From Swiss-Prot:
NCBIfam families according to UniProt: PRK00440.1 (NF001679)
Cited SMART domains: AAA
Originating gene: rfcS
Family: Belongs to the activator 1 small subunits family. RfcS subfamily.
Amino acids binding ATP: 49-56
Keyword Secreted appears in the UniProt entry: no
CC annotations in GO: DNA replication factor C complex
Name the record gives this protein: Replication factor C small subunit
Source organism: Methanosarcina barkeri (strain Fusaro / DSM 804)
InterPro entries: AAA+_ATPase, ATPase_AAA_core, DNA_pol3_clamp-load_cplx_C, DNA_Rep/Repair_Clamp_Loader, P-loop_NTPase, Rep_factor-C_ssu_arc, Rep_factorC_C, RFC_lid
Its biological purpose: Part of the RFC clamp loader complex which loads the PCNA sliding clamp onto DNA.
Matching CDD domains: AAA, HLD_clamp_RFC
One annotated GO molecular function: DNA binding
A Pfam entry, by short name: Rep_fac_C
Length: 334
């Protein structure tokens, strides 16, 4: 593969779905949306779910299929509420687009408001009034990570669709397609690493693959490259760190922690996040091997949450992470 190809193209744009059928891992939701497209009878929509699961791609695909390739750009606009959280974005940008007539004989236009849960309560109230005022010639598609942060009057005016986190199989299938198209060689552990770092986020998976391909343009992409380019610890190292600390070997665990912090260059928050993930994903064999009771697991999760909070408040990474390992070691019944 040519190195210039990696530099010139942004893969999340190149491989973004352009039709609803191409949106991965949301089969039930997509089938319901396709029924709206088929009749061109579209209500206001609210898409809820984690990042990188197809919410934006679905909104754009709806516009493409309803208006056609020639007219969808004229009848569709996308705004990101996290950039402008206040009421002005509703009063100006949204109203200016909503009050103009649809182009090309279309019955309505579509306004896609991404990260709508970032809008303040006042801005959401203004948005609700705007939705009512322009309902004859405008349809709103709102996207959010947390539907609980959308005021009830807006939710009641929308058909709500919940996008789930993508399965490992859906992520891998898309990565295999891209690898074939880009003529990439990816090892089995490379695919496993991409699935691990993505955590069900297709956008993150594709970006991680492109970053690794840029670093190793003419080599087989393995898990080492993936973890290095995404600033992620090898999950095996995290499991070993946890196991060492839980067995009471604090000094050995601290040495491994220092390696992750200073040699691997990982952040404290990333390490805590991976420790939490490893604890959550422990299988029964490891739980039995370490002698972990249900009560002890609850205590571990509780202290992980406390350390994570302290780090977000600006506490010293090394001290907090060592305190976490110390808590693990002290919980050893031996």
């Amino acid at each position: 593969m040519e190195d210039s190809t990696i530099k010139e193209e942004i893969w999340i744009e190149k491989y973004r779905p352009v039709r609803l059928d191409q949106v991965a891992g949301q089969e039930e939701t997509i089938e319901r949306l396709k029924s709206y497209v088929a009749t061109k009878n579209l209500p206001h929509l609210l898409f809820s779910g984690p990042p990188g699961v197809g919410k934006t791609a679905s909104a754009v695909s709806i516009a493409r299929e309803i208006f056609g390739e020639d007219l969808w750009r004229e009848n569709f606009t996308e705004l990101n509420a996290s950039d402008e959280r206040g009421i002005d974005v509703v009063r100006t940008k949204i109203k200016n687009f909503a009050k103009t007539a649809p182009m090309g004989g279309a019955e309505f236009k579509i306004i896609f408001l991404d990260e709508a849960d970032a809008l303040t309560s006042d801005a959401q109230s203004a948005l609700r009034r705007t939705m009512e005022r322009f309902s004859n010639n405008c349809r709103f598609i709102l996207s959010c990570n947390y539907s609980s942060r959308i005021i009830e009057p807006i939710q009641s005016r929308c058909a709500v669709f919940r996008f789930r986190r993508l399965s490992d199989e859906a992520i891998r299938k898309r990565l295999e397609y891209i690898a074939k198209d880009q003529v990439l060689s990816i090892t089995e552990d490379g695919y496993e690493a991409l699935v691990y770092v993505s955590q069900g986020d297709m956008r993150k998976a594709v970006n991680s693959l492109q970053a690794a391909a840029f670093v190793e343009p003419n080599k087989s992409i393995s898990r080492g490259t993936i973890y290095r380019t995404t600033a992620t610890a090898n999950p095996e190292d995290i499991r070993n760190l946890i196991e060492t600390a839980l067995r009471g070997n604090f000094r050995v665990a601290r040495k491994e922690l220092n390696r992750l912090l200073y040699e691997e260059g990982l952040s404290g928050e990333d390490i805590v996040g991976q420790i939490y993930r490893a604890i959550s994903e422990m299988d029964n064999r490891m739980i039995l091997d370490l002698g972990l009771s249900e009560k002890r697991i609850v205590e571990l999760v509780d202290i992980i949450g406390e350390i994570d909070f302290r780090l977000t408040e600006g506490a010293t990474e090394k001290i907090q992470l060592e305190a976490l390992l110390a808590h693990f070691a002290l919980s050893n019944p031996d």
